Design a protein with these regions (language model features):
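Bacterial N-terminal signal peptides that target proteins for export
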Residues: 1-12
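Post-signal peptide N-terminal segment of mature Sec-exported envelope proteins
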Residues: 31-52
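Short, well-structured beta-strand
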Residues: 29, 122-199
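Secretory pathway targeting signatures of secreted, lumenal, and periplasmic proteins
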Residues: 53-108
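Bacterial signal peptide processing site
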Residues: 24-27
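Solvent-exposed, polar/charged alpha-helical surfaces in well-ordered, non-transmembrane soluble domains
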Residues: 57, 61, 108, 112, ...
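C-terminal motif of bacterial Sec signal peptides marking the signal peptidase cleavage site
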Residues: 19-22
């Protein structure tokens, strides 16, 4: 019977031990806490909307004003689009022409559009505000996985009906969009507070 030299046995044992140690340190598959992408938001700076419409307001310098190109759009409907944030504030305006029936229809439509979100909303909070320009506005904050998180409308009940609603062109969950929602909401309040009718 042949015996291996003692040194060779020791080397074999060391290699066997190292291999076993390497196998025993399996990767850790512990779930990591949920994280969100970092979003750097610019400071709030504003510019006035041009005088091509029967209203004016201040909007963010980070946004572009685009005409609404949908087939239902009226001439003074706009989109205030934030390209870096994939956010869009849809603006609809209707001259109610001292027409009580048209005014009532616009009020009903505004409530229906907000109400459509009840299926996914965990809460819809309505506040009535008075702007520095003396306008009364209904403001809606929606929570949950809703397509529109913030909306408002204001009217003088005789001629002007103005509505704005925030939408995102992304499938990202609203909880991860929270800083961006707050950022654009701040801009929308500035829009509302600076809103004036000019025709």
């Amino acid at each position: 019977m042949l015996l291996a030299p003692l040194g060779l046995v020791r080397v074999g044992m060391v290699l066997l031990g190292a291999g076993a140690a390497a196998c025993s340190s399996a990767p850790d598959f512990t779930p990591k806490p949920k994280g969100y992408n970092r979003i750097d938001l610019p400071p709030h700076r504003y510019r006035p909307l041009g005088a091509n419409h029967p209203y004016t307001f201040q909007y963010s310098q980070e946004a572009k004003v685009l005409r609404d190109s949908s087939y239902l759009a009226q001439p003074d409907w706009l989109n205030v689009y934030y390209p870096k944030l994939h956010a869009n504030v849809q603006i609809t305006y209707t001259n109610v022409l001292r027409n009580r029936q048209l005014y009532n229809k616009m009020m009903e439509d505004a409530r229906k559009l907000t109400g459509k979100h009840q299926i996914k909303a965990t809460s819809i909070e309505e506040k009535i505000l008075r702007t520095p320009n003396g306008m009364r506005a209904s403001v809606f904050e929606l929570e949950g996985e809703v397509p529109s998180q913030f909306q408002f409308y204001t009217t003088d009940s005789t001629k002007h009906f103005f509505r704005a609603a925030l939408y995102f062109r992304t499938a990202t969950a609203n909880d991860s969009l929270a800083p961006v929602i707050e950022y654009v909401k701040y801009d929308m309040i500035q829009m509302l507070n600076s809103l004036k009718y000019i025709k």
